[in-house]
């Protein structure tokens, strides 16, 4: 009799446990491209931005299947030859085109063609311009990541958390129903 009870409980709770496993927290993948004449200057910017993005905890810096693309055009300004006067960073925020809806509307035999022809399309989302002294380069880079996080990542993170919370409420109510039926 106990074995039957355990089997019934397993059958009842297994789908709920499986549902709970799909509740992954928010994470995103960001590609970073920096364009600058000076390799040392470019390297510093890549290092500062990458480090700051990774410190967010839910961001992976990668070129493979990014959710976001940050393109930074960096310039150094000089006074009379070699003396650095300032830095200018133009940041463009891009998002790869989400072709899922389009592919759902296309005839099956054309899906591969449509998928290939839309790969690599990026949607322009935002642009910022930061200007400062060379000694403030790190704080300028931190500001870029803070702006990117607050304007683009944070809303997605909050949306994902709301989805998780509502799924947990649904699982909780299903469990309560099952427990009440047992009583």
Task: Set out the residue ranges of the language-model regions.
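Extracytoplasmic
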Residues: 25-29, 65-70
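N-terminal amphipathic/basic membrane-interacting segments and domains
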Residues: 61, 66-67, 144
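Surface-exposed short loop/turn segments
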Residues: 56-60, 69-135
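C-terminal/domain-edge helix-coil "capping" segments
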Residues: 101-183
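A mature extracytoplasmic/lumenal domain signature
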Residues: 36, 49, 65, 74-76, ...
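A structural "domain/chain start" motif
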Residues: 16-56, 156-183
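Sec-dependent N-terminal signal peptides
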Residues: 3-20
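Structured segments of extracytoplasmic/periplasmic soluble domains
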Residues: 52-59, 147, 151
